[in-house]
Amino acid sequence: MERNVTLIGLFAALIVALGFVPAIPLGFGVPITLQSLGVMLAGAVLGSWRGALAVLLVQALVAIGLPVLAGGRGGLGIFVGPTAGFLIGWLPAAFVTGLIVERLRRVPVALAAGIGATLGGIIIMYALGILGFWLVKNAGLKPEDAPISLWAATAIMAPFIPGDLVKVVVTGLVARTIAQYRPSALLARG
């Protein structure tokens, strides 16, 4: 139990620390950050529930106003901004990534982590992120936000996919390295 709490806190800290790497703004409210890599790693290494709890801890820190997101952002307003869908999507992304690594025990861990990170960290996170971005842009909260189609919201997010595919590869390599040198630390397979 104590080990689980420690690792959940450690991965929450990793996600926060990755927010200190400067974000790359693209001009439409959703920056490129490394924090989604931390989400993928939390699921792949800790497993479904522990990975999701690490993400939930970070989301709680954001909600109470701590500036733990890339660019020093935090507060409840983040949950109604253009990145809200992605931030909300972190929870199921970590859970699904971990669940896939747990279930694909006969598959090499790097491949299982890559499949999990692709399904959880890209497909699920993007589905929620695009939907959230589209809803915010069509809510008319800001005068400069002209309504956009769901297809346009999807096209706007396309530049993020290559970078996230690199994060998938990194997740697989890190999971394989942990499995090779410290297998007891790969809780998703424990």
Swiss-Prot record:
Q: Give the protein's recorded name.
A: Biotin transporter BioY
> TM spans, by residue?
8-28, 29-49, 51-71, 76-96, 115-135, 146-166
Organism per entry: Rhodobacter capsulatus (strain ATCC BAA-309 / NBRC 16581 / SB1003)
Pfam annotation, one family: BioY
Q: Which InterPro entries match?
A: BioY
Q: Which UniProt keywords apply?
A: Cell inner membrane, Cell membrane, Membrane, Transmembrane, Transmembrane helix, Transport
User: How does the protein associate with the membrane?
Assistant: Multi-pass membrane protein
Where is this protein primarily located? membrane
Q: Which domain of life is it from?
A: Bacteria
Question: Cross-referenced Gene3D superfamilies, in alphabetical order?
Answer: 1.10.1760.20
Q: Which GO terms describe its cellular component?
A: plasma membrane
Entry function: Central protein that confers the ability to take up biotin on E.coli; while biotin transport requires BioM at very low (pM) concentrations at higher (nM) concentrations expression of BioY alone suffices for uptake.
Q: Per its record, what are the GO molecular function terms?
A: biotin transmembrane transporter activity; identical protein binding
What family does the database annotate?
Belongs to the BioY family.
Query: What's the subunit arrangement here?
Result: Part of a biotin transporter holocomplex composed of BioM, BioN and BioY. BioMN complexes can also be readily purified, but not BioMY nor BioNY complexes. BioY homodimers are also seen. Only the BioMNY complex has ATPase activity.
User: Can you say where in the cell this protein is located?
Assistant: Cell inner membrane
